[in-house]
């Protein structure tokens, strides 16, 4: 086995702020790549219509299932609670791109 095969995939739940001030929530294995996709017109239909987007929140989770569950939890929050979540959890240097 190669050294690379021992590297565990990281999963993240993320939130971006769209140009219309709305939040879009999703999950990914690479938040910076995913934001670039959203801004390059290769993301979700919503972000293509309301871009550009800015990464405002990233949370690492255990696995794919956890990412989906956390995404659903965040999507149920209202706008003010999403804004508070982003404000209370500043991006680490790794994701300031």
Language model features: what each stretch is:
Residues 1-44, 48-75, 79-80, 85, ...:
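GIY-YIG nuclease catalytic motif and its immediate N-terminal context
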């Amino acid at each position: 086995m190669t050294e690379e095969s021992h590297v565990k995939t990281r999963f993240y739940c993320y939130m971006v702020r769209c140009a219309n001030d709305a939040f879009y929530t999703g999950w990914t294995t690479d938040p910076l790549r995913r934001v670039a996709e959203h801004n390059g017109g290769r993301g979700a239909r919503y972000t293509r219509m309301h871009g550009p987007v800015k990464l405002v929140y990233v949370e690492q989770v255990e696995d794919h299932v956890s990412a989906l569950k956390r995404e659903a939890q965040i999507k149920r929050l209202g706008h003010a609670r999403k804004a508070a979540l982003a404000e209370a959890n500043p991006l680490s240097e790794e994701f300031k791109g």
